[in-house]
């Protein structure tokens, strides 16, 4: 029997890209699939595609920035399939590129609400359902390699993806005793439409801001090219399956991107070395690490 057979997954941003590819991957292994997406037209297309593949599927509209909508989707999932065993917090947006001055507050709020709070809400709603049935489960949070290093002129995006990595690290420790495995997917450039995410921006985030700088427009053009030439989404999805079966916490898809992460780690190591050599800190060099397990 498959690890996933007869279990149920809720996948946000499930109507296309990585979300739809994961729906196919887990569905092919016997899972019931709930695809939730803000785009109703794309949702209907994806639902038909999954049904054609013989996958039990429920399609539900979802704005991940709305906690009430998350609760509605979870209720629909339980009503249809009985239990929820997996959440894939995949929905994400890029936001328009720009400098500090050019990135308006509504762009920040949109990216924070979707990329960060959407993950928080999805996890807060589904984890109690997994704990209730006691059969274990999975929390799969989709971040990005941008969570390990800066992407020029895309600070809201990189900040939220770094936050998703940090949240998953904490949740992994918290949920492991419950038999719930939390992991964070950090793909490199993949064939999705993340560079076109403005098309799904709700009216409440409209800013009326003017066009970005020439540098931002150049970045947008470069992003389109690398996304179009990126890894196929189905390869990313199969990598997720592989990682879930081996209980990996950090799920990387592009081994050649290792140097991007090492820039931060190497810089941190060098900064610690400088701190250790500071006369101001001489008496603190050998302080023990705090032990939070003690009462």
Describe each model-derived feature in a short phrase.
Residues 123, 160:
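Active-site helix of classical SDR
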Residues 177-255:
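SDR active-site lid
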Residues 29, 149, 170-180:
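Active-site-adjacent segment of SDR/Rossmann-fold oxidoreductases
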Residues 2-34:
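Canonical Rossmann dinucleotide-binding motif of NAD(H)/NADP(H)-dependent dehydrogenases/reductases
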Residues 144:
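Residue(s) in the substrate-gating loop at a strand-loop-helix junction
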Residues 40-41, 60-72, 105:
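The beta1-alpha1 cofactor-binding region of Rossmann-like NAD(H)/NADP(H)-dependent oxidoreductases
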Residues 98-100, 104-110:
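Substrate-binding pocket helix/loop in short-chain dehydrogenase/reductase
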């Amino acid at each position: 029997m498959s690890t996933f057979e007869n279990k149920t997954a809720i996948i946000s941003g499930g109507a296309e890209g990585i979300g739809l590819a994961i729906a196919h991957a887990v569905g092919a292994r016997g899972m019931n699939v709930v695809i939730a997406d803000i785009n109703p037209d794309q949702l209907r297309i994806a639902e038909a595609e999954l049904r054609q593949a013989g996958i039990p599927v429920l399609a539900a509209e979802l704005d991940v920035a709305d906690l009430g909508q998350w609760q509605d989707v979870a209720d629909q999932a339980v009503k249809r399939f009985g239990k929820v065993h997996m959440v894939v917090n995949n929905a994400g947006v890029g936001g328009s590129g720009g400098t500090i001055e050019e990135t308006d507050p509504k762009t920040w709020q949109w990216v924070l609400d979707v990329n960060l709070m959407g993950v928080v809400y999805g996890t807060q709603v589904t984890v109690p359902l997994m704990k209730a049935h006691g059969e274990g489960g999975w929390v799969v949070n989709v971040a990005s390699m941008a969570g390990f290093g800066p992407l020029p002129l895309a600070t809201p995006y990189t900040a939220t993806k770094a936050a998703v990595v940090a949240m998953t690290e904490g949740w992994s420790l918290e949920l492991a005793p419950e038999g719930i495995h939390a992991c964070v997917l950090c793909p490199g450039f993949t064939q999705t439409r993340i560079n076109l995410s403005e098309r799904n921006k709700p009216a409440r985030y409209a800013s009326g801001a003017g066009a970005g700088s020439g540098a931002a427009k150049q970045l947008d053009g470069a992003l389109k090219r690398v996304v179009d030439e990126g890894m196929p989404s189905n390869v990313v999805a199969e990598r997720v399956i592989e990682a879930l079966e081996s209980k990996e916490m950090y799920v990387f898809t592009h081994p050649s991107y290792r140097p991007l992460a090492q820039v931060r780690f190497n810089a941190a190591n060098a900064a610690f070395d400088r701190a250790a050599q500071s006369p101001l800190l001489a008496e603190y060099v050998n302080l023990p690490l705090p032990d939070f397990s003690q009462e």
